Amino acid sequence: MYQIHFYQDAAGHQPVKEYIQELQSGNNKDSRIKLNKIRDYMRILELKGTRAGEPFVKHLEDNIWELRPLRDRILFAVWINESFILLTHFVKKTQKTPKREIEKAKRLYADLLERSAEK
């Protein structure tokens, strides 16, 4: 079984965790559906890792993967000791994952590596 961690920036913000909490506080049906689907996909990632394959996870480039619940995308990276770090999220509106979202995930991952090396 794999572990899932949430990326936290230097200011203490956790973008993916905050998004999930936002969905939890939503009172509409769409929020509940999204939240349940994200939780289901996170459970699959915990159980099967990247071997779950499509439609659950997809490799994008380098160390960046995407979790694919509905139109939501959660970009993550493989982390230490068979774990994953959820970096960022967005709602997919085009056929192809936007390059700027992949670059953002790479920046966050590089930041995480740099800050963890300082410890």
Located regions from the model:
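Short, surface-exposed beta-strand/loop micro-motifs that present aromatic residues
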Residues: 74-77
